[in-house]
Amino acid sequence: DRRQRQMCIRDRYKPLSNKYLDEMFKHIRARFGGYNVAKHSTAREVIKLRREGRRIAVGLITDQSPNRSEAHYWTTFLNQDTVFMDGAERIAKLMDFPVFYCELERTSRGYCKVLFDLVTETPKQTADGEITECFARRLEQTIRREPAYWFWSHKRWKNKRKESVQHG
């Protein structure tokens, strides 16, 4: 079946409070054949596609500072106490998907290549936080090597840890 051989492209996004702008941005994001999935529906969408026998690759951009409600994993990152979203790790463990670290390498003006590095083929066998910690270490290496390419305005350290939260 042709549909099962095609790769499903889903764009995880945070819905905007302004419904008009939300629809406009969804339309812009979907113009190349992607399909928008609200961030709170990501795991359900992945499960649905897997049940349908569809080929799935889940790419999550997780270098931004999470909202307090999303703050799940704390570690030292660039010498700062930093919180990371752990949704990618949770989905990988739920579905037992292999995990790759992905980075872009600029080759010339306007061109880059995408590099994938295997983190684990067996996420269910990893300790809680291990995948997210590996991501944090790899991201830190990437930033130290190419600091100009990181988007520094993410307000990465706006969240402060409560004393009761465990450190990664």
Name each model-derived stretch.
Residues 12-41:
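Membrane-interfacial amphipathic helices and adjacent loop/beta segments
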Residues 40-168:
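Non-catalytic C-terminal accessory region of glycerolipid acyltransferases
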Residues 5, 26, 67-69:
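A generic signature of intrinsically disordered, low-complexity regions enriched in glycine/proline
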Residues 5, 34, 74-75:
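Small-molecule pocket liners
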Residues 1-9:
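Single conserved hydrophobic/aromatic residue that forms the stacking wall/gate
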